[in-house]
Design a protein with these regions (language model features):
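A charged N-terminal "starter" segment
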Residues: 1-146
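Conserved anion-binding
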Residues: 119, 128-186
């Protein structure tokens, strides 16, 4: 397959087998075009590097929540990293497997936690002790268990801009490296 999805044939541009001119006539300009073939090829190429290793590639829904894109990825075995109940609902409507959904982010509401537990998602990425206690409380009220992972700040400086820094002891996301055991005991 060619590296570009835009192909010039007889003086006319095509994306896959569709003439760009007809797309402009039908949709106007500007517009977004995604190549299903290219998306699948790239996803499978990336996935092939993990052959023989138990893994799950999770697409960050916040990067593109287009239902068609999510559906293509779901059909090809992708998992999903979500940060809201709305993203969870989009993945479910795109036929994504809830058992392949990881719920990240610091702003999870009680309703979003309840929705995710009721859909039996793979795991919550926990960012703080207080969030862990909220998830535990909601799960208990539903008489269910919630799987978690804990985002640990290893106190490593990646030398990025201070406003986007993560991984340091004083960063707002995640727990410090001495806290996970205390959180788990709760």
């Amino acid at each position: 397959m060619a590296s570009s999805i835009l192909i010039l044939k007889n003086g006319e541009y095509f994306i896959e087998d569709y003439p760009v001119k007809k797309m402009i006539e039908g949709f106007g300009s500007p517009f977004y075009v995604y190549s299903k073939e290219k998306l699948i090829t790239n996803f499978n190429s990336f996935k092939s590097h993990f052959n023989g290793i138990n893994h799950l590639i999770c697409f960050a829904v916040k990067s593109n929540s287009n239902i068609g894109i999510l559906n293509i990825l779901a059909e090809n075995g992708a998992g999903f990293d979500i940060v809201s109940g709305g993203e969870l609902e989009r993945v479910i409507s795109a036929k994504g497997d809830p058992k392949k959904i990881v719920f990240s982010g610091v702003g999870k509401t009680i309703d979003e936690i309840r929705l995710a537990i009721n859909h039996d998602i793979l795991a919550f990425n926990v960012e703080s002790e207080s969030e862990l206690l909220r998830i535990q409380s909601v799960a208990k009220s539903l008489n269910k268990k919630a799987s978690i992972s804990i985002r640990v700040n290893p106190n490593v400086d990646a030398k990025t801009h201070p406003y986007i820094s993560t991984g340091l002891k004083d960063n707002k996301f995640g727990v410090n490296e001495d806290e996970p055991c205390r959180c788990i005991r709760k």
